[in-house]
């Protein structure tokens, strides 16, 4: 800007109003103004009044002296040229040609003229140009007054225009006069500010307030430590404010000295302190605009109160005296913007430049703009500049230059003396970036050569001592901040460290919980929570739901508008901000009062051992933790909640590890080699990298062709020099140079730009639906060559758009517009750099086309491979393992965002940008590469390509297995599958081997190296053969009818045949008990038992008992044998030793199946014992405290049985009584008498027994005897032999008693109690009389439930337990287990309460079963999917219930209250049926015979939202799931068919795989037509129509000769297995088929079995053999008694043959009977009468009296007797 006046080197003449000016100067020079509204200094109005102020008041204003005044004078039409012009420059236009609004300008100028009383005719306002307006004057005095007035009003803040005097008549004395006037004006203004300025007043009030607070603390005695610390903090704040005021006054005095020093005027100013440095270097002519800007900037600094302002002179002193200084100041102290201005103001840089480096380009540009704005008018134009990129042709010319540390490094390489730079400021040194550390090391060497160079290292949290010691123990200056005190609260989490649920670490949930707790309990104030990633931030925002608060995300991928939301106010709602470490130092959020520190941060770390850069979550450093805590004390005292312990904090690193130890050193080594540093290991780093990192970096540079080794010294190649000039990461530079060689320069530059910004281009934020939409939008850009090609296509399309459309296009396609612009800036910088440094022309055209596959794709892939040759990974061949990194052998997966996944394929070889370590490790920025290209690399890759390819896992498919076999092959929860995988890996010594089962495709995929494939295949085939054998042998154990007693059992198996019919009540099923801690392999265990017993297993049931349940934990399961002989043999063997564990087999409690299946009833447990050591006759009674005297009185004279006992007090114990003379009495016998005499139940009595134990029978013998006795006493209800189980424990040497555990069926509790009561006091065989059995009158049982069930039924369970407590006879106790579950222990003195209480508990804890006709196996299988699990969780949350899914049996139960169960059942049925229906309306876009790019083609053809299909199929609702490659159709089946047709047409088009083959129609072997509603048989996998199979079953039921039922396929004939019958037939039909099969079995048994002779009786009995006697069969169904030999009524004592004859001729039996007997017939009724003794008078049953001698008949007995006496001489009695 031009000066307002010429240099003040002219004198004043005697004729130029000396007296007036002298008087004006002397009287008004140092007087301050009394009020802002008073007229300007030395100014009087000159218009419309006497002009006494002017020398000749007779002349009017603007009067020229060459003309005489005349009252009639009228000015000519053409105005005369003015002598003086005062121009007004607008501040916005002072340094530019900015166009201003003319009307606004004119209004402002006219208002200002009116204020200064300037005539309207003097005003001129141009429409264009940088001059806002001007005033014309003829008289000097008017012009001078106008200038002074305008500056006065500007100083008062009434306008912003800059006055500038343009004199047409130059008189030196006039200029001096004006200078004096303005100097007086400015001096008065400065004095006014120092005395009464508004800023000064506020600061003084603040000092007074702080002083009062300090005094109030000082008046108190005995201050606590916290209060004392608070006092110290306030004193520090007060001192800071005082220093600010002193600094302001010092600056004002510095300006005053400059103002008065021009002409040597004396002024009463305090002398400068000794050694003080002038804060302003003001020389030469007065620049009033600059002086005013300096004053205003000082006022702003005073009001802003930046802490560094108080340290200005202290900083300047140090910089003037010392060459190096470390400046430590907290974020927000102002060091980044103010220090450069301090140095520029003070002139420390002289005529050279001050350079301030920043780690990031955006920071350098932002700070330069800010400093330029703050210092506007304080310096000349272009004093402050920013150099974001290096150019070898540009020189540093500005006074203050902001640039990146990378840019300064490039300058250093060009000019190793940094000529033209006098001061270097390294900002943000606490970040310890690679460039910063390298720059510090190079500057250290330079400082010894350039003594005039100054270095200032600025940091917020850096280790000042380390930096000071590194720089020759230089000085450290600490700038204390203005933070408020922050209370630290350590609140470590109870969850296991690093535990992960659903991909989210546990600490994220802890942060959300803490935020909820703070919101509920703490006062108002914003909550700021620190997490590590965008995913965690979004997860936390979704989980934090509170009406009175708003959760806001803050991370680097948000747009500016979204980030700005955290700075806005939300009335009535508390802000809860979940942020990444972007909120640590980069941003200052107002109002934050509470901080939640998770203690975790995500860092990129280079691992020299593997040569990989890994982004992983780790602990923060102490300095970062303090930074986070400091966020809570910006505006008021705050609190920081650290979710870790104080010990954890103490164990953290003090500072963040320097980047030089965390990143690849390629760029640094290139620059050092370019600088001639040959021995890098001995280079003087601040923190030297580990030697391995240096070696790996050198190896990488050699691989890239940038470095070669000659004579043991590494030298740069020609390509290496080019990479140095580019200043990029070597891999990016290699990428660009490689593309230029293939004439694809544009593509190479863009690739380098997008690769550097790859993680932020696609914008996947928001809720779940938003993210899914973003995924769909991304598909249209996905390229089958990988992520870099995808990013390249995105940039190409974006760059082709007009600029005004780009932002909207990014928004529509979920792209980050800011990242795209950043890529564009990078592209432009690279183009300029390449043209300037490499003299290459950057092409403006594209060669590569993303829509066409050409040679350019191959070239690009080759260039990318050459640039990332060390980052190669090979697909292992096994999806679960993913890719194997070539250098390290790690198995990692592609990141879910990888473009390759959109094509459903995994290329064999890929290159990747970096490894991302979150919960798992992922490859990111992945590009496919060709196998042949690996051999073309020069130099060759640092791994053996051929060897890696040989180790690749091959795949072998095992087909022909049914879904049932595959499920059983996997086992419950895949345990059997995992076991066989473990065995295969152990056998082959290869942990990569895998086995994958696809039930939908009915195949097993084996993954193994070629050499091991046969071993793995053999293992799998053996297991499959086992499962197939068991499936073919599988039987249903069915009772022929329901009832007790001797109920026949049939084994109903494959072919619908009866495999065995058991009518002799021999058991077939055994319970298997496993005693061992290791998890057992079920298949191995069953195979072991079959071999040991030499029998076939036909049914297996695995118990689902909780391992923590002490009653059930040893039970493995239940197995059924095909023959009772095998079952008996299994139970006869005492123990099986299996892999170091013990197996025991017992006859099973519960057998049967179908409608006659007997339910298993929970067991009740009782304990018994008998002594092993004989009694000594003495015992001890322990009394409750304080009751011994009373008890002694009660038992003073005691007789027990026939024994008189002696009572005495124990002298060695205060609460014991000794009792002797007991003989062989037991503890129970004595205690019963004692309790009766004392009427107490709290006594404790024990007998002193002899030292040695007597010989007892073995535990096995005791078990058998006890079982025999108890079972004999329980036989009233014909119980099964297995209703009682007895276990006698092996005693230890020091045990006084033998102990046994008895378990019995809870239904028989009454019989069991009676049996145990009778057993009490008995003596077992082989025991002595005193070894009496004692049954503990305490029965126990327990039941366990999971924590989830407990939380659901907690209230009902408590109510139930409370009711149990009120009942007599039993107790219940609830206790948690160590694994988080809950156990209910039931204790009672009788068995019935135990059984009843357990039954009610089981009903509550096991829930209500859900039976719905629509819940088929296929429908219920949805619940095992991820969507099904989420569905159950949602219903559980909404209905407050818990849903139990039995995955093995596919049954569903619901726990909760009756009302809630009903609601949950209704919702579950509705939701699951809807989901099943939707699954029927899914179209899959991925499969073995589907073109891999089908999903992209669908998106390309119909749009990401499938709008093209919706327009053609009206009313259909479609949604594309990109993760699963599925189109979900919501609409009718007809709509689905239409959509499917459109997709199929697209799929048939030409693709990389060619046309899709036509589907082969399958013919049903029964109806010989195309299969309709097909079903594959489990045994042979042949496909039939389901209806045909059902018809086959129906025909077999009608024709008994059709058994067994076989597969109808030609050359098959395999029996249809039980699994098929269960799947195809209802229970009713299955029972009907069983009945038909039973009839067929009996009919075809060759007479071995027969049905009961009673019509329609279902019972069957075994026919006695020819040599067997006819044993009776008592039918349990109809109670008939039948001879098993002749099948007639049971006929004891008569042979079957004779009984048959008697049946045929009843008289024959009478005659046979009468032989040899005194027998005659009644003459009347012909009845046979046998006479054995007595007289000859006989009476027949017909009532007639008969004479036995002559058979005469009489009606009465007297005539008969008379006849005997008369005719036969007597009645026939022998006298």
Swiss-Prot record:
One of its GO terms (cellular component) is chloroplast. Residues 21-34 have a biased composition (Low complexity). Zn(2+) 3 binds at residues 1652, 1657, 1675, 1678. Belongs to the DEAD box helicase family. DEAH subfamily. It is found in: Plastid, Chloroplast. The active site is at 1735. Zn(2+) 5 binds at residues 1722, 1725, 1740, 1742. It comes from the Eukaryota. CDD domains: BRcat_RBR (cd20335), DEXHc_RHA-like (cd17917), Rcat_RBR_DEAH12-like (cd22585), SF2_C_RHA (cd18791). Residues 1-77 are annotated as: Disordered. The keyword Disulfide bond does not apply. Residues 35-60 have a biased composition (Polar residues). Zn(2+) 2 binds at residues 1580, 1582, 1607, 1612. Its EC number is 3.6.4.13. Residues 1560-1767 are annotated as: TRIAD supradomain. Keywords: ATP-binding, Chloroplast, Helicase, Hydrolase, Metal-binding, Nucleotide-binding, Plastid, Repeat, Transferase, Transit peptide, Ubl conjugation pathway, Zinc, Zinc-finger. A zinc finger (IBR-type) spans 1631-1696. PANTHER family: ATP-DEPENDENT RNA HELICASE, ATP-DEPENDENT RNA HELICASE DEAH11, CHLOROPLASTIC-RELATED. This is ATP-dependent RNA helicase DEAH12, chloroplastic. It catalyses: ATP + H2O = ADP + phosphate + H(+).
